[in-house]
Amino acid sequence: MQYLLIVKKALGMLEKLRQAAREMRVAVVKMTTAAGSGHPGGSLGIADVFAALYLGGVLKFKPGDARWKGRDYFVLSNGHLNPAWYAALAQAKCIPERELTTLRQLGSRLQGHPVRGTLPQVEVSTGSLGQGIGVAVGIALGMKMERLPNRVYCSMGDGELEEGSCWEAFAAASHYKLDNLTIFIDRNGLQQNGRTEGIMTLEPLAERLSSFGLNVINADGHDFTQILAAFKKARATKGKPSAIIFKTTMGKGVSFMQAKHEWHGKALSQTQAAEALKELAQ
């Protein structure tokens, strides 16, 4: 009986995450279409990972107290995926869902990239690729020096890894044995102008990260069981930082957007949005 209850609870969690990710994708389409700009492709692709991070018991936070001292720190180094992050914050009751409609509006707290001083959940302004990871390493080092239990999570894009500053940060994280740092990479193989491998070769990515002293974990970024297991494994790792490579699909959930780099930073038309929302409702 106890086993059946555990299984039922686990299945309930997975369904909760699937529903949340679906609603996040709907929000991404609606808010970027209303704004007429933004980055819907990658946001649709990372939705499952963000849902697991915020609703799967991975990230420690208090919805009503964004500056809680016991919180885990989250840095969105690939800051253009803000639509997905805002949608996750709404699902986690950190911000009102109605506020999502203000994306990129003058005076809105929800700017196109994270801006410190707008939302209290923004730990650092990001968007210039390759910079957020350095700050995340600094926060993790500070936690270590103060002997604090807080963990640091840093979201990165695979195209972002073309920036040399990322690798300097990885080297420092390894040098200081920052096992309180979990880096996760959105490996969709695409960036603004095409395929990552055609612009700057990243493979063998796992081996490269490992050579910098990181504990590398590979996972399907659309399989919640794998996503949660990867975060759990990273948390259990001692003596070195972890890097999770999440294999994802840009534009996930919308057939005409999937695996197409053209949707990196282009909003949908009203007609396209209606079709996308129809697919996401199925």
What residues fall within each predicted segment?
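Positively charged, low-complexity intrinsically disordered leader regions
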Residues: 12-13, 17
